[in-house]
Amino acid sequence: MECVISNNAGAYALERAKNKGIQALCISPKSYESRDAFNQAFVEKVMEIHPDLIVLAGFLVAIPAAMIEAFPNRIINIHPSLIPSFCGVGYYGLRVHEAALARGVKVTGATVHFVDSGMDTGPIILQKAVEVKEGDTPKVLQQRVMEEAEWQILPQAIDRIANGRL
């Protein structure tokens, strides 16, 4: 791992990266005059690093088209649902789990997928199901999905890609 970039200066991932001697950067749209200026700065920074793989985890900013074009099938995302359920515009963080509970699903989970020009529409790499339990709140369900699915399948997907098994 060469670099961790977050759009949130308070992200724990930045602190963890620094503690491991990994470059940690915050590039936030709030720091730029326009979305175009942010997109340009973001793409330029990533191009400087020239990563083999870009892993999105909790990055709640749409990826610029120029980056998707520059890194085809080299950007992956973790999403806290079993795509195609509860995904796309407006479905992120607790909102996903609120929607799952409101719908009354019995099973939810997480998906690792390649990033394409759509929102959560890229080819699926891995999925893992998680039981919804009676009395779950969005926060409780979110934590269970992270622990039982996200934290397991994201490293598995990275390993498969890194070792040419995908």
Question: Where are the model-predicted features located?
Answer:
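One-carbon transfer enzymes
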Residues: M1-L166
